């Protein structure tokens, strides 16, 4: 691709209402898996001023204190005062949790074949490219890093007037398919009422943005919109209702790749919405790292109760060194994409999910689906 273009992605902070919900959902999932790895969990959360509602379907032998887990997540994020409209000590925590439908369970846990079927029908996408060292699209990768830097500045006291809710949007200019310049940075952060707008703008630009983005990408043409409304005191659940699963593009590739529609947080790995999306990322990343293509998007689909994928699709956007059909043959040879195969390969029946609920599910080496363990075998095909 030789044309010049711009592309935009956004990220949100751990104090964003939707991300509060995601973190609570995954913290509850982790607590259950720590006691009962075979549990079936679909945990949904709603947060609003002074209230958290936890719902969903959970079938488990474990007992966890949902209220205590919820309060500790909110405390860790930093909502510790009723002046913010949300306080971990005084908020109400309501529960509306049921069990998994036996009709679903009989398809997932096939007692005759002992084969784990997919938890639902659905389609999942995985993506990787060479534009960053973590094989992620640059706009979403750097947007996440901006939000991480902001959280560190808030929690360390470096910028004591920061509050938990924030979001940023990053537009990068591309030439020949690679990022070369920052076109626009949009940055909105909740703050205490006693900080002057001009002081906030300077601090965010100098101490957050310029410390994260490559200096060679910034110039006098770069546009900055920092708290462009001028005031962001009311935020978090006081400002907006938050729900689990409403930041699926933030969680994945920032819009650079397609999305099957299913969210991740609060779901145990029998749900292919989550586990197969992780597997698809693993496949795509290894394909790119092995040199089979510079970009790779993979689609997998499943039928409920059926173990093998119903389809696999690959697009390398004209960058492939092999035919797409040949890459699909390699996928069938080197990757087990049944639900049980995915769970076993990535050791997914562990309490590892809360850390995924902020700053994206991809691009961090601590996640098992980010391993480059198939590169040697795949590269033999070249």
Curated annotation (Swiss-Prot):
Q: Name one GO cellular component term.
A: cytoplasm
Reaction(s) this enzyme catalyzes, per UniProt: L-methionine + ATP + H2O = S-adenosyl-L-methionine + phosphate + diphosphate
Keyword Secreted among UniProt keywords: no
Q: Which domain of life is it from?
A: Bacteria
- One biological process term in Gene Ontology: one-carbon metabolic process
Pathway annotation:
Amino-acid biosynthesis; S-adenosyl-L-methionine biosynthesis; S-adenosyl-L-methionine from L-methionine: step 1/1
Question: Which coarse location class describes where this protein primarily resides?
Answer: cytoplasm
**Enzyme class per UniProt:** transferase
Q: What positions does the entry give for Mg(2+) binding?
A: 18
Work out whether the entry's keyword set contains Metal-binding: yes
**What CDD domains does its record include?**
S-AdoMet_synt
Annotated residues that bind ATP are located at 16, 165-167, 231-232, 240, 246-247, 267
The text of the family note is:
Belongs to the AdoMet synthase family.
Indicate what this protein is called per its UniProt record: S-adenosylmethionine synthase
Q: Which organism is it from?
A: Legionella pneumophila (strain Lens)
The encoding gene is metK
